[in-house]
Regions:
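N-terminal beta1-alpha1-beta2 module of alpha/beta enzyme domains
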Residues: 1-85, 208-211
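Internal, glycine-rich beta/alpha segment that forms the wall or movable "lid"
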Residues: 4, 101, 106-217
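Active-site beta-loop-alpha junctions enriched in small/polar residues
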Residues: 13, 58, 96-98, 125-129
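The substrate-binding groove and active-site-proximal loops of carbohydrate-active enzymes
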Residues: 25-33, 65-69, 90-100, 141-145
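Glycine-rich anion/phosphate-binding loops
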Residues: 29-38, 99-111
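Hydrophobic residues within beta-strands of alpha/beta enzymes
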Residues: 53, 91, 120-122
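Short His-Asn-centered micro-motif
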Residues: 56, 94-95, 215-216
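Glycine-enriched alpha-helix->loop->beta-strand junction motifs that scaffold or abut catalytic
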Residues: 85-88, 116
């Protein structure tokens, strides 16, 4: 009989998921905006042998009605710092396909994947509040079906980008002056409904592969 394994991660969310958790006497509300606190949590999760440290995201100030602490580090920036202080735990950051361009997201994730030596994953969301959309030159979020359609294309384009430039292209032959073998670089020339991407990504995908993709919820 094959033994099945459960993968466990920790969602580091402010002082806790309950809106009033920050008011508890033992809460760490004063440290929410301190990257050293986030690093401490990630190290604790790594020590406990958890598989991943997961950062959600929200892109507007919420919680005025409850006083809930709702501000965040931008997750990929925070994970860059956390990756240099941890060694084995997976690191998952949240990216909204409603606001990001796939080329930008793929580059950021590729950079983090190499900085962390292959430990980065991305939680792809479509966002859920109009107040977020209004920070990105929109009046409201598109209908859910359109957001999911865009997200599907977003993910497909990122995957194509990660396949467009791999380490096999790197030659670095000093005598001949050849740095890259362009046979291994494949510009996308992509024309889709939501995205148009002409070239290849300019960060090579390492031999240990692309970032892992997740969808929470």
């Amino acid at each position: 009989m094959t033994m099945k394994h459960m993968h466990l991660s920790v969602l580091a969310y402010s002082t806790g998921l309950h809106p009033a958790s920050w008011r508890l006497p033992h809460s760490y509300v004063e440290e929410v905006g301190d990257i050293d606190f986030q690093i401490k949590l990630a190290k604790l999760a790594e020590k406990g042998k958890l598989d991943a440290f997961f950062l959600g995201d929200g892109q507007y100030i919420s919680g005025e009605e409850t006083g809930h602490i709702s501000y965040y580090f931008e997750p990929l920036t925070a994970l860059a710092a956390i990756s240099r202080e941890t060694h084995s735990i997976g690191l998952i950051g949240t990216i909204s396909s409603s606001f990001y361009e796939p080329y930008l997201a793929a580059r950021m994730l590729s950079s983090l994947h190499q900085i962390s030596h292959g430990r980065i994953g991305a939680n792809i969301v479509t966002s859920q509040f109009d107040l977020e959309a209004q920070n990105y030159s929109m009046q409201a979020l598109p209908h859910l079906e359109k957001r999911y359609e865009r997200a599907d294309e977003f993910i497909n384009v990122m995957k194509k980008l990660w396949e467009s430039f791999t380490v096999e292209a790197i030659v670095n032959h000093k005598n001949s002056g050849i740095g890259l073998n362009h046979q291994y670089i494949h510009p996308l020339h992509y024309q889709g409904k939501y995205f148009q991407v002409a070239g290849a990504i300019n960060i090579p995908t390492p031999k240990y592969g692309r970032p892992r993709l997740f969808q929470a919820g």
